[in-house]
């Protein structure tokens, strides 16, 4: 899901150095800015197909700070970022992007109305095609695995919480809210390994829970069910034997790791974001933009000092380079502008 960390002259270092529970190191890399659009707004999400095919979507605002309902889309072709116009898309936002190939790029957002209806467009390599969405249906966290295979969670006019599947012609409903499960995030490593994380109620408490699609049916995951009371839980499915679920409670960051046989519990340092866990390509994992976990060692990373906010980390496939979508004040102005940072390990 789209979540932001707000920064004000952001940095991790304190007068006494980096504060960590245990060993922390510093890498030789650094986040650096690679693109900033000259409009008020922010990037919500990026999707990298290759180092020469990257998509970014976001929101733009009026000078009064109101959202402009027109999808804000940028594409990187390996040498430059260019503006992309989706025909006949006025009246909607661009909240998320998902891509499995150059001919399968999905962009979605909300209509400018009071019914919370999602609008979805797919780039097929030649043109944009509008994907039909039932009225009063709100799709979040869409994972586009193929032109005829996409998963999402959200709500509809009949169900408060549900999981949806696109089969090439329509959206099908799977899990409904009567099962006592409220989805919060979705991730997939392939068509037979799709995970949805969320929470259930145990008495008056919220506990972490998950479901997995094995290619044929959704099943509840046998796992620990810790209590949480803040943000998450979010999921990263790297493979059937490598899955991470992260969340916050009031004071601490937590994660569960599935190694194919057992669940392992992890408490993360304060600068680690358990809602954005991404493999680093070297056997470690980014926890947001400011922490890398390799084995049991945490590496603290700094984002450049700025005022604004940033979202999730995206790995560029086939590389150890990463992108960070953000909204950053620039040029001495208080106007936040859509910005992309990059990190090379």
Language model feature labels by segment:
Residues 26-345:
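Residue-level hotspots at or immediately adjacent to binding/recognition sites across diverse folds
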Residues 1-26:
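Secretory targeting and sorting signals
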